[in-house]
């Protein structure tokens, strides 16, 4: 039994479920249908849940000025309401172009002079910083004749990519500077051996045996703890029998 357990953990570390879950959430080049993208695709301000992925802005009823605008943040949809498979992602982590991740090096820090420099996990620990990457969203603004005009009949007037937040990056995830693929791009290599990867981690003051799976917030390592919820999204109240 011990041999089977050891064999399993050679390919799956103890925190693999944390890293795999975060990678599934993260919007990266190899994950166009990330959970981040799905959240943006389902954005809706309508009470009935229609117009998913878009925001309609209409002028006040008493005002004669203003335009009917449609702001699209999600991916394009067909007439059947389904996401078009060829539609490019609209949310990007660490870069304004998700289709080009060649320049992505992991989390960054904005220095006092306004310049941005790569931030390694060790530097974040020593400087009491947050290990984060910027998140960008592509906004498309269309002008409509009325509040009921379909998106496909509206006129495109502007497109812009906007930084919306900074996202904490899990150590050893696809968005971390210690990720094997990110390290390979940083060293400008086609591939990297286990020995070369371990040597790189040591050069960054990291333990090659560290499985990751945690965040660095304010220089402190923070880990998510899995709990079994008895009743999700419900408040449980018990009567005090003593009173």
Briefly describe each language-model feature range:
Residues 1-243:
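Conserved N-terminal architectural modules of multi-subunit, DNA-dependent RNA polymerase core subunits
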């Amino acid at each position: 039994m011990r041999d089977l357990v050891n064999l399993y953990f050679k390919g799956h570390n103890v925190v693999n479920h944390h890293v795999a879950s975060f990678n599934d959430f993260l919007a990266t080049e190899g994950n166009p249908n990330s959970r981040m993208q799905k959240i943006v695709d389902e954005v809706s301000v309508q009470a009935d849940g229609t117009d998913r992925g878009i925001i309609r802005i209409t002028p006040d009823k008493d005002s004669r000025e203003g335009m009917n605008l449609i702001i699209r943040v999600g991916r394009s949809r067909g007439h059947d309401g389904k996401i078009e498979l060829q539609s490019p992602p609209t949310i990007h982590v660490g870069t304004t172009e998700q289709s080009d991740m060649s320049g992505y090096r992991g989390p960054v820090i904005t220095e006092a002079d306004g310049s941005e420099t790569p931030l390694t996990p060790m530097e974040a620990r020593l400087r009491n910083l947050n290990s984060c990457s910027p998140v960008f969203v592509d906004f498309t603004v269309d002008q409509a004749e009325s509040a009921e005009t379909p998106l496909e009949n509206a006129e495109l007037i502007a497109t812009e990519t906007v930084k919306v937040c900074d996202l904490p990056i899990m150590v050893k995830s696809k968005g971390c500077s210690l990720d094997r693929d990110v390290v390979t791009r940083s060293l400008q290599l086609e591939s990297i051996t286990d020995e070369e990867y371990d040597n790189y981690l040591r050069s960054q003051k990291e333990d090659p045996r560290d499985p990751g799976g945690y965040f660095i917030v304010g220089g402190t390592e923070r880990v998510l703890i899995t709990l079994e919820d008895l009743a999700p999204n419900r408040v449980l109240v018990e009567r005090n029998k003593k009173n």
